[in-house]
Amino acid sequence: MNTIALYLLTAVAEILGCYLPYLWLRQGASAWVLLPGALSLALFAWLLSLHPDASGRVYAAYGGVYIGVAVLWLWLVDGVRPSAWDLAGVGVAFGGMAIIVFQPR
């Protein structure tokens, strides 16, 4: 699996693992949503271990992908259209991620 796909899958696992307990705590969903939420967070932790680079660099670069996926989640799941400020923030985060990922080695 390529690095970007791994980052995307990791971000979805983390967001889903946090969103499901939110549904239980704030939206009155059944406590059963905590089980897939816990599994999703376990998957997130395991996926982080698959990243091929130094962990600090991986977490820093992954942060840019997480921000992008979170704004996409805002739009697709929460039904809130991202503002120009949201999109600018994603662009800045992706720029920072690109500096970290594509640095000369």
UniProtKB/Swiss-Prot annotation:
Membrane-crossing residue ranges in chain numbering: 4-24, 28-48, 60-80, 82-102
GO CC, alphabetical: plasma membrane
InterPro entries: UPF0060
Stored PANTHER family: UPF0060 MEMBRANE PROTEIN YNFA
Membrane topology classification: Multi-pass membrane protein
Protein name as catalogued: UPF0060 membrane protein Reut_B3679
Primary subcellular site in the record, as a coarse category: membrane
Subcellular location: Cell inner membrane
Keywords assigned: Cell inner membrane, Cell membrane, Membrane, Transmembrane, Transmembrane helix
Pfam family name, one: UPF0060
Native species: Cupriavidus pinatubonensis (strain JMP 134 / LMG 1197)
Family affiliation: Belongs to the UPF0060 family.
